[in-house]
Amino acid sequence: MLVSSRTNARVKQLRAAFQGHARLSGGLVAIEGDHLLEEALRSGLVLKTVFVSEGRIVPSRVPTSVEIVRVTEDVFQSAVETQSPQGIAALLVPPVPLLEDVMRRTPLILIAAGLQDPGNLGTLVRSAEAFGATGVLTTPGTVSAWNQKALRASAGSVFRVPVVAVGFDEVAALKTRGVR
């Protein structure tokens, strides 16, 4: 079946996720494009729904348990935020790492304090992965790592490097434990 209505419930959920409305999207995160989809699959994330525009083929790596929604080009473009969409998007369950996940073994952590440019955060997460960091901590006022621009700039690293939002009190507690 080909969805041709912009008001279809699944399309509205995808649009809400792209706009960062977690409550309206059921807490799911939207990704767009072949590369991010491949990185999400490679990282073992749980895909809930894959959206493909007409004429696109669903990648064979997508598990058969994942719901596939085929949409017209017009509907696809109305739901995603990129100017030149690739015709494939997905809703996924974002990982929810804990501070303990980042602190396991000898930690190498990056703290992003008050970083507001999503592209910069994504680049830092990608660099953190390249340097073998156990995680990235973000303080209040820092943009979400699940922001669309941050996701693209991370090139999928945000799927593998735990990014944990912490308060300033937790950062201070880490300093008293000798973490620098």
Roles of regions detected by a PLM:
Residues 42, 91, 96-97, 101-180:
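RNA substrate-binding interface of SAM-dependent RNA methyltransferases
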Residues 47-49, 87, 175:
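A common structural microfeature
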